[in-house]
Amino acid sequence: MAVRFVAEVSSNHDRNIQRSKDFIKASSLIGCSGVKFQLFKIDQLFAPEILAKREEIRKRKDWELPLSFIPELSEYAHSLGLQFSCTPFYLDAVKELEPYVDFYKIA
């Protein structure tokens, strides 16, 4: 089994597709095997009563990766020879990601 290095972009994309692609490009340049994002919806990650009480948590909506980015990011990663992954944080995300990801990380 070969060792693989996967760059964790997480939520650092700033909801900006070019910034996301820049992370992918940098991952390729430093020799990573793959790149991983996260797909979550803040209203499914936290209970409604938590969201109602905590403005700083509601602001995390800005950390959501737009689902519309996934096909383009996957294609770009593959064009650079990288595997593409995105951790699903809600059940439907698995179906949404399936056509685009090479692997899932489960923690």
Segment roles from a protein language model:
Residues S10-N12, Q38-I42, F89-L91:
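Active-site beta-loop-alpha junctions enriched in small/polar residues
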Residues M1-F5, G31-S33, H78-F84, Y100-D102:
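Short, well-ordered coil/turn segments that N-cap beta-strands
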Residues M1-N12, F46-A52:
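N-terminal small/glycine-rich loop or linker at the start of catalytic domains
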Residues H13-A26, S68:
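Glycine-rich anion/phosphate-binding loops
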Residues E8, S27, L97:
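Conserved, mostly hydrophobic/aromatic
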Residues D22-F40, Y100:
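Catalytic domains of carbohydrate-active enzymes, especially glycoside hydrolases
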Residues R60-L65, L82-Y90, V94, D102-A107:
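Catalytic beta/alpha-barrel core
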Residues S33-L65:
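Glycine-rich, proline-tolerant flexible connector loops at the mouths of alpha/beta enzymes
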